[in-house]
Amino acid sequence: GASANDKWNDLQISDSSIKLKLSKNISGAELRKEISINENESVIYQKHTFTGGEGRIPVGHHLMLKIPNKAFISFSDFEFAGTPPQPIESDSSLGRSVLKYPQNVTDLNLMQRFDNKLVDTSVYPFDTSHEDLYMIISKKDMPFGWSAVSCPDQGWLWYSIKNPDVLPNTVVWLSNGGRYY
C-alpha cells in the first residue's frame, strides 16, 4: 500500500527524532509518522496519526527480525491463534509450509504440523526450510497488548506494546527459507 511504498516527506528532523508526512492521502486521510529515541534508552518509539478521510481502512505495522540461532516468541493473553484456510506454500515445487491449515489453538506450544504431530511455535526455528503464518487474536478488554521476541544467545529482546482496541490481531509470519523462488 501507499504507506509502505510511496514517498514520505520530511517535516522535522533532529538528532533524536524524525517527523514525516506521506506524499499521498489514504482514503482522503493525511498520514504522519513520528520516530524517536531517548538518550540512554534502547527503545525506538513510533507513532502514526491519520487526520481526516472517510471510510474504514485496515491498519497495522510489521517488523522483520533476523534470528541467527534460536529465539523465543511470546504474547500477552490471547483468545486463540489461528492459521489461514490454506498453507502459505501449497505447491511443493515452489515452497514448503509445515503447520496444519486451518487450525485454532490456545497454546502456542501445541500447534499441529501438517502430519498432525505437535510443535512448539513459541520457539523459533521449530523446523527447517518453511514458510508459515498464524494470527494471534487478542483478548478483549485489556488495557494494552504486547508481543516479544527474545534471543538470549545474541543478547537482545524486541517488544511491542499496542492498544488491542485499535490493533486487536497480531500476524506472525515465520519465514525460514521455505520459498524456492
What are these regions (language model features)?
Residues 1-40, 74:
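Extended, loop-rich substrate-binding clefts of extracytoplasmic carbohydrate-active enzymes
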Residues 2-4, 29, 42, 58-60, ...:
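A sequence-composition feature that detects small, non-aromatic residues
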Residues 5-9, 16-21, 62, 133-136, ...:
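Intrinsically disordered, low-complexity boundary segments flanking structured domains
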Residues 15, 53, 154:
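Residue-level marker of positions within ordered structural domains that often coincide
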Residues 22-67:
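Acidic, contiguous internal or C-terminal segments within carbohydrate-active enzymes
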Residues 56-57, 66, 70-181:
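A contiguous, surface-exposed recognition patch within enzymatic or periplasmic domains that forms
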